[in-house]
Amino acid sequence: MALSAVQKVVLFSCLVLCVSLLLPRAYIARGKPAAQEGNTGLFQSSGHHPKPTDGRPGGAHFPRSHMAEAMSKAKGGTGGGGGGGTRPSLVGQIIPIYGFGILLYILYILFKLSSKGKSTKQEPTTQPVANGNLKRKITDYELSQLQDKLKETEEAMEKIISRLGPNSERTDNVSSDEETDLLQRLKEITRVMKEGKILDGISPEKEAEEAPYMEDWNGYPEETYPVYDPSDCKRTQQTILVDCSALNRPSAEQVAEQMGFDEEDDQENGSGNLAKEPDYKDSVGGDQQAQGTISAQGKVVGTGEDIEEDEDEDEDPEVIAENAGFISDSCNEEEDPKESFMDLGNEKGPLGATLGSNRDETGTLRKRNTKGIEY
């Protein structure tokens, strides 16, 4: 059974790891018995001395200096044995770590080789993609492979066309199988190239445009088509008439403002006329001959001197403003001026005289003065 390159490298790394773990133990096992033998020999030689034949004790024969030297030698022998035992133990600790690092390095090299092998290995021909998997991404490597296939098919088609030319006589050499194979390859390549251009964010409109029409497709429903009525173009639109007089009329706010201004002017003029009433009463006794008739339009007709005074007062701007206010008030309040003036003409006493003096000075009858006179 043939092993692949990856399996061989893994097996070799396992062997190296096992050896690195077992060798230190073997060295340590050999060093311990040798150290024990050396230590026992020293203690036996130092402990068993020949007994003296004389009656002297053994301790008295050797001085104390010799005993100290013997003890130091014994300690040095044991220390040397211990030092020899520590060296194999350090080696046993370092070798497994070193072997583990080698194993990691081998695995890293294997990973690199496997990744390179995947990139360089030629992939099989792409199968036609289903309609539901249109959004599949195509790598650059696949696109390069498709371009190479396109070049090959173009060259093959050029050869076929050159053989099938009018001047060529070798038309029988080209088989129909080759033509069908080339056509199938071209169809597959064009389909995959189109799918490669499709991105993840494709819109359904583009999908509908690129999707081929099915055999049982009957077209869009009639509801999607807009209803076109040519008679609408011939119809004439109705004209709209706008009343311009309504546009020129003042609004209610403008009318209210005008009425407010008129009332203010009337109040100012009324205060001035009330101050002049004593003068009017004094002039009644001296000017009893001044008589006038009131026309239907509100004008006072009298003597020549009165007419001249009326003309002077008509030129006064204050009188003009008061006349304008009187006209606006008379238009808003629908009252008959003739009846009010006739009632005032029938009255007697100083009120009639004051009315005559007012007529002489102002030249027109103000509604304000009539209201003040009535009460």
Swiss-Prot record:
Residues 112-375 are cytoplasmic. Disulfide bonds: none annotated. One of its GO terms (cellular component) is endoplasmic reticulum membrane. Residues 38-47, 286-296 have a biased composition (Polar residues). Residues 1-29 form the signal peptide. The keyword Endoplasmic reticulum applies. It is found in: Endoplasmic reticulum membrane. Residues 365-375 have a biased composition (Basic residues). The chain crosses the membrane at residues 91-111. Residues 38-63, 251-375 are annotated as: Disordered. Residues 135-165 form a coiled coil. The keyword Endoplasmic reticulum applies. Residues 30-90 are lumenal. GO terms for biological process: positive regulation of protein localization to cell surface. InterPro entries: Ric3, RIC3_N. It is a single-pass membrane protein. Its main location: endoplasmic reticulum. Keywords: Chaperone, Coiled coil, Endoplasmic reticulum, Membrane, Signal, Transmembrane, Transmembrane helix. Residues 305-319 have a biased composition (Acidic residues). Pfam families: RIC3. Belongs to the ric-3 family. Molecular chaperone which facilitates proper subunit assembly andsurface trafficking of alpha-7 (CHRNA7) and alpha-8 (CHRNA8) nicotinic acetylcholine receptors. May also promote functional expression of homomeric serotoninergic 5-HT3 receptors, and of heteromeric acetylcholine receptors. This is Protein RIC-3. It comes from Xenopus tropicalis.
